[in-house]
Design a protein with these regions (language model features):
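Loop-helix junctions at membrane interfaces
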Residues: 1-195
């Protein structure tokens, strides 16, 4: 007797959000939602970390985006970073701060997680964080030169004068905190995500 081929369905209870070749399961979407929520909540934790520039603050949302990138790839990490800050913008209207946060995180998370994805070792993670950190540092300095004069009364020459004493040290400390935070929590979280 010939067997009847099974039909593929798009029923809501199949717990899949893609076709056979896709990789976005319901579990992955739920995990993404949780990561975005945690990123959003932590974006409101503002810690002054550099006494010379009390207006520049560190928030742990970058750690969440970096963990997402390491766990699911650069696209997901970037998505978590961008969604976190777009939602933040709905509650605190600060387009300048949001733009700077997105540029900072995307330039860190994308290269770091792309390198780690191709070398899933501690060495790959460290190399990714170093390259991502350098990219983020460069982007933050350049973006400050362009964006800050557009949104504030600070001139380009005043921003340029802040590069060495304020912008580079602050962003280095911020990047190190994000990378160390990710390194400390990534393994336990990745085990929980794969369970």
């Amino acid at each position: 007797m010939a067997q009847t081929p099974q039909l593929k369905t798009n029923r809501h209870d199949t717990h899949s959000t893609t076709t056979q070749g896709g990789s976005w399961s319901t579990k992955r979407i739920a995990t993404l939602a949780v990561l975005c929520t945690v990123g959003f909540i932590t974006s409101f934790i503002e810690i002054p970390i550099f006494p010379l520039a009390a207006w520049l603050k560190f928030d742990p949302s970058g750690i969440v985006a970096l963990v997402a990138g390491f766990a699911f790839g650069p696209g997901t990490g970037v998505l978590v970073a961008v969604l976190t800050w777009f939602v933040h913008l709905l509650f605190v209207f600060d387009p300048y701060g949001v733009l700077m946060a997105i540029l900072s995180l995307v330039s860190l998370v994308a290269p770091a997680s792309a390198i780690y994805r191709h070398d899933l070792t501690l060495g790959g993670a460290v190399k990714g964080m170093v390259v991502g950190g350098l990219c983020s540092l460069i982007i933050c300095v350049l973006a400050n030169l362009v964006v800050t004069p557009l949104y504030t009364a600070v001139s380009i020459s005043d921003v340029a004068a802040m590069i060495v004493p304020i912008l580079i040290p602050f962003n280095l400390i911020k990047i190190i905190l994000e990378c160390v935070g990710c390194a400390l929590i990534y393994k336990p979280i990745s085990k929980a995500l794969s369970a």
